[in-house]
Amino acid sequence: MSERVYATYWMETGGDPARTAEVIAGEQSSGTFVALATETAELKERSGARVERLDILDTADIPSLPGGMASDRYTRAILELSWPVENFGPSLPNLMSTIAGNLFELHQVSGLRLIDLKLPPSFTNAFAGPAFGIAGTRKLAGVAQGPIIGTIIKPSIGLTPEETAQQVRELIAGDIDFIKDDELQADGARCPFEARVKAVMRVVNDAADRRGRKVMVAFNITGDLDEMRRRHDLVLAEGGTCVMVCLNSIGLVGVREIRRHTQLPIHGHRAGWGYLYRCPSLGWDYAPWQQLWRLAGVDHLHVNGLDNKFSEANASVIAAARAVLSPLNHAAPMGAMPVFSSGQTGRQAAETYAAIGCADLIHTAGGGIFGHPAGVPAGVEALRAAWRAAMAGASLEDEATRSPALRSALGFWR
């Protein structure tokens, strides 16, 4: 008998919840809008989606989303569905069509959000997952313990390759561990990819010869498949140790193809995540979403940051990071490294460390480093000092007595 995939949803409906659950199950498996003689009991038993659980929560007077059936009461519930793996086989795109396809558009539904996903070993074992993960990333970055201290090239776009390389030079002078392109910086006319990689890697390789370790730079290779392969190969040939892709831009198939080709860690940027999560009555929670990208082979996954510049609450950020650090299942851990970013400074270090319970993470600060009044190297040292304090259980003020860079940073980290 085929193992099953289980997906859990928050659901709102103006109709009978049990009937709506059956409509969703039918739409996402063997059913259609009319009864068919060919949809036999045996076929439904073998291939149909099952309603595993339906827990009523509460009701509302108005619908969360427009365009559905009119009603004087809208019932909210937790719905769990399951499907046999044989319906779609070991395919991420076809899994996506099943668990997150037409069901969001059904007129019976006035709210639907995918909140959990359980994948059996018969599915997860078909995927290689991250090639490097936490241990491989630490080895390449030369950071055996503690957080990987990182940044984003700023301004995000508009610098030339030479100006970018100069920023990298200043960051390395501050002993940075990790540098990434902004998601907007790919292969524009002012900063062509090849010229940028060569200019930056000259600086990185020269510094590595002197420092004994090489800073990890995540170059944004996002593009068409052939472009991404060529860009990856250039980074590898120049001695680079990481490539970055924008996940929603290239999709699961794009990531899988790069995973098959790559000899470097894949840094996964979640640009566009807001349209999937921001409406609480529609879309995805991060926990099920990130599973698919880890299966596809992503080594680092952005999770936003505490007290960020966006709209996401701290509790959601923490849940996202914990999800990335959790094994997919007992047969396939597929661990990846959470990346904290967005309005980050050293002030978030202690709370981040306490919430996650470990330092297996990349903490990137753009303005929090580049805006330091004493310059970029001092900005790097200030962030590192903040993490020393966090891991030692000391206050920033106490650590600042030993770190002039941190002391001056406290005035502009607001």
UniProtKB/Swiss-Prot annotation:
The keyword Methyltransferase does not apply. Involved in catabolism of D-apiose. Catalyzes the conversion of 3-oxo-isoapionate 4-phosphate to 3-phosphoglycerate and glycolate. Its EC number is 3.7.1.28. Keywords: Carbohydrate metabolism, Hydrolase, Magnesium, Metal-binding. It comes from Xanthobacter autotrophicus (strain ATCC BAA-1158 / Py2). One of its GO terms (molecular function) is magnesium ion binding. It catalyses: 3-oxoisoapionate 4-phosphate + H2O = (2R)-3-phosphoglycerate + glycolate + H(+). This is 3-oxo-isoapionate-4-phosphate transcarboxylase/hydrolase. The modification N6-carboxylysine is found at residue 180. InterPro entries: RuBisCO, RuBisCO_lsu_C, RuBisCO_lsu_C_sf, RuBisCO_lsu_fd_N, RuBisCO_lsu_N_sf. Its cofactor is Mg(2+). It holds the Pfam family RuBisCO_large_N. The keyword Repeat does not apply. PANTHER family: RIBULOSE BISPHOSPHATE CARBOXYLASE (PTHR42704), RIBULOSE BISPHOSPHATE CARBOXYLASE LARGE CHAIN (PTHR42704:SF17). GO terms for biological process: carbon fixation. Mg(2+) binds at residues 180, 182-183. Pathway: Carbohydrate metabolism. CDD domains: RLP_NonPhot (cd08207). Belongs to the RuBisCO large chain family.
